[in-house]
Design a protein with these regions (language model features):
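Conserved class I S-adenosyl-L-methionine
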Residues: 1-25, 39, 68, 72
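Conserved Class I S-adenosyl-L-methionine
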Residues: 30-125
Length: 125
């Protein structure tokens, strides 16, 4: 995946989580999907592991959702964020705060946002 800044939906999600839990926001999105986004580091790690990266391509696509509220519900209840949210507070009220922040950033009604991933092809050295 690309950095958090290259994923509009998840950047809005993280902003909502930071608003809901300013002292201790869940860090799953920052540390797991977006925590290994530097292709220079990934390629170096591949070389250390005995692979040679023969192609590195960053792909940006546009995601679509019926609403920011639907995105908030899906992320909060249907990802590894859920137990982290429930350990800090109420799932329903947190989802509402996250939805408000996501709507402020993405708009109301149907939403779209960019998302970037890195595709790396590697072969044994």
């Amino acid at each position: 995946w690309g950095t958090l800044e290259t994923h509009d939906f998840q950047a809005a999600l993280v902003a909502g989580l930071e608003r809901a839990f300013p002292e201790d926001p869940p860090t799953f999105m920052v540390s797991v999907p977006h925590g290994y986004a530097d292709t220079v580091i990934v390629v170096a790690d591949l070389r250390t592991g005995g692979l040679d990266a023969v192609r590195v391509e960053s792909v940006t696509l546009e995601g679509h959702a019926a609403s920011a509220a639907d995105l908030a519900a899906g992320y909060c209840a249907g990802t590894p964020l859920r137990p982290a949210i429930e350990a800090r507070g109420d799932l329903s009220s947190t989802t509402a705060v996250v939805a408000q922040e996501m709507e402020a950033r993405l708009g109301t009604g149907a939403v779209k946002g960019s998302m970037t991933a890195h595709v790396i092809e590697a072969v044994p050295t």
